[in-house]
């Protein structure tokens, strides 16, 4: 017996024209092109699927887009030039890599407040959080390092030299490994 096909909605950040094209993957057609802030970069979906979070890098903000209406419904603060981010496993916190000031900004989504700014290496980019939410990792492109951060204290616990220009970080589902 054949398994049923799955249809999803895909969201893209289009840096060149400051838009977020939304695609129905069943038809592979653009449903809507949402006008967003300047130089959109990182993008993620809330765990309940109700919101898309998008880095508007040149506006120094995170835009919150309602997935039902495809409208921008809110903005969250960020440091200069937010590039990429990761959502905590409980969906309450965003960890944002801010390229221009070499910081990871910790944002409480509900209160829309910056909880902490954590100094990291030059050109922070990749972001990952462990499945248990206790450890966050940021990669710095220019310094070729991975910075391990305790999410309770917002302190860097370790800096590890990795290969040249790491741009991505992701933990395995069991949390035993992190890939750069």
Predicted regions and their residues:
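Predominantly soluble domains enriched in secretory-pathway, periplasmic, or organellar proteins
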Residues: 1-180
């Amino acid at each position: 017996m054949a398994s049923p096909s799955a249809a999803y909605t895909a969201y893209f950040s289009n840096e060149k024209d400051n838009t977020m094209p939304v695609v129905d993957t069943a038809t592979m057609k653009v449903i809507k092109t949402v006008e967003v802030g300047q130089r959109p970069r990182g993008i993620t979906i809330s765990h309940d699927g109700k919101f898309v979070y998008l880095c508007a890098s040149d506006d120094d903000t995170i835009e919150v887009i309602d997935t039902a209406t495809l409208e921008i419904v809110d903005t969250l603060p960020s440091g200069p030039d937010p590039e990429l981010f990761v959502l905590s496993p409980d969906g309450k916190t965003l960890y944002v890599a801010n390229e221009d000031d070499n910081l990871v900004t910790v944002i409480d989504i509900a209160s829309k407040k910056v909880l902490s700014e954590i100094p990291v290496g030059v050109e922070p980019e990749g972001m990952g959080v462990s499945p248990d939410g206790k450890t966050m990792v940021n990669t710095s492109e220019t310094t070729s390092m991975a910075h391990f951060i305790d999410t309770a204290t917002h302190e860097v616990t370790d800096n590890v030299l990795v290969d040249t220009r790491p741009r991505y970080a992701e933990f395995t589902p069991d949390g035993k490994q992190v890939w750069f």
